[in-house]
């Protein structure tokens, strides 16, 4: 395996280059096709911090760690009470004495950075309010399965400028995806995010941000949506329903896209809100393939990041008599 990612943190999609993303995806495809990735996590203990609830994230990471020979140890918000009972840095310094790496699903990107600064082993983001890099690896894998490529793939993201949207902007800039973001006025990605994505752009393929879905969908290959109200925004739910209502991914909206366009959603879905049952459960939906790809993408990422870590931290030899 390539050592380019060995021992590295993944806090943002922007931490990766195009070649590194391709290496993860190539290995993920190999794993999905039944290839043996070995046991690069043999003898390693992995601390999983879940400040927020998870379903796909926890299960996919735990299965991936087990398959690679490691041992996952999950800690939940009510146990660690990050920022209340202890600081992120103090928690990290203790976990660093027990575990060989940390996978963290947190509210704050600042806390994630603090943990990474205090832990000697690799730290992987399993989501913050700012970004969702592992989701994007699975998404890019799915796009490649559907379109046969990543560079130049025409992806329409319908939603607000949330963490997934931010990671999509960075990934699109790095990989050359033709990304079109459609949001109601006032819900666009932050200017700082757009500026950073523009700096990451490595070729002529650009991204656009607009309010009208029709021109964006005209030649779309992927129609991607996400919840209108993310965790922590519950007080805004009714207003968001009103503002986003015309952007529901239903059969009427999907008719604006070519017949071959496929639908993606990072889940969980609010059925009947941002997407209808008839679309989510249709032959045009690859949503559950996309969810499955979380396992393969994260398994590949772990195999590359922890490649050689066990050798650098060998098991102690038995004492001689």
Label the predicted regions.
Residues 1-59, 63, 131, 316:
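Positively charged, low-complexity intrinsically disordered leader regions
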Residues 122-127, 179-180, 283-288:
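Short hydrophobic/aromatic-enriched beta-strand-loop microsegments
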Residues 51-64, 147-225:
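Glycine-rich phosphate/diphosphate-binding loop of Rossmann-like nucleotide-binding domains
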Residues 198-278:
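Rossmann-like adenosine-cofactor binding region
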Residues 260-261, 266-321:
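Adenosine-phosphate binding glycine-rich loop
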Residues 40-46, 151-153, 260:
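Phosphate-coordination loops involved in phosphoryl transfer and adenosine-cofactor binding
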């Amino acid at each position: 395996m390539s050592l380019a990612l060995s021992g590295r943190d993944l806090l943002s999609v922007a931490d990766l280059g195009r070649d590194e993303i391709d290496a993860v995806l190539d290995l993920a495809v190999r794993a999905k096709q039944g290839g043996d990735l070995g046991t690069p996590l043999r003898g390693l203990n992995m601390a999983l911090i879940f400040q927020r609830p998870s379903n796909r994230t926890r299960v996919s990471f735990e299965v991936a760690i087990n398959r690679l020979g490691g041992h996952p140890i999950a800690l939940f918000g009510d146990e660690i009470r990050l920022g209340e009972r202890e600081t992120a840095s103090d928690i990290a310094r203790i976990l660093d004495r027990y575990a060989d790496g940390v996978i963290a699903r947190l509210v704050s990107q600042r806390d994630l950075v603090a943990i990474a600064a205090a832990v000697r082993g690799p730290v992987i983001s399993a989501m913050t309010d700012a970004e969702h890099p592992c989701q994007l690896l699975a998404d890019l894998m799915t796009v490649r399965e559907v379109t046969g490529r990543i560079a130049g793939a025409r992806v329409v993201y319908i939603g607000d400028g949330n963490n997934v949207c931010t990671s999509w902007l960075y990934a699109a800039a790095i990989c050359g995806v033709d990304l079109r973001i459609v949001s109601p006025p006032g819900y666009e990605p932050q200017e700082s995010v757009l500026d950073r994505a523009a700096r990451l752009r490595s070729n002529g393929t650009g991204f656009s941000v607009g309010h009208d879905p029709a021109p964006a969908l005209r030649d779309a290959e992927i129609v991607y949506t996400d919840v209108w109200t993310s965790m922590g925004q519950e007080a805004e739910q009714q207003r968001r329903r009103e503002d986003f209502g015309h952007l529901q991914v239903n059969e009427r909206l999907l008719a604006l896209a070519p017949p071959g366009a496929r639908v993606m959603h990072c889940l969980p879905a609010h059925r009947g809100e941002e997407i209808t049952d008839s679309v989510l459960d249709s032959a045009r939906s690859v949503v559950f393939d996309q969810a499955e790809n979380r396992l393969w993408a994260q398994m590949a990422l772990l195999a590359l990041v922890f490649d050689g870590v066990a050798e650098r931290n060998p098991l102690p030899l038995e004492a001689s008599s």
